[in-house]
Amino acid sequence: MKSTKSYLVVGLGRFGAEVSRRLYEAGNEVMVMDMDPDLVQQASSCVTHAVVGNAQDKEVLRALGVDEFDCGIVAIGDSLSDSVLATMNLKELGIPEIVCKAHDETHKKVLLKLGADRVVIPEQENAARLARSLSNPNLLSSM
């Protein structure tokens, strides 16, 4: 049984860059993809593979062999259409687990309907975690 997983992270904004770095530091195989060559260059030392490319192009994804990855993370949260196309392509190419970033509840619903296994709204989740910790300072931070 393999102890590490392979991840494809699409989008190298703050969220995508941080997720990919942490997954790589945990010993996983991580490929990142973004259309911005500067962001790809910055990430290249913190991941297994860094690629300049457009995840909205299914043929680009197919050529990279993304169907071999255990999990695809769509970290394009600002553009509904870009994240929808990337999610749809990853789903159609057979990635077994797809996690997406959304910017609001409507975006989240659309991504779930497309077949995303999990959708996070980072600002909402972080705000809830902060409010809980401020309201209950004696609770362990891991709760």
Each language-model region and where it sits:
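Cytosolic regulatory regions of ion transport systems
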Residues: 1-143
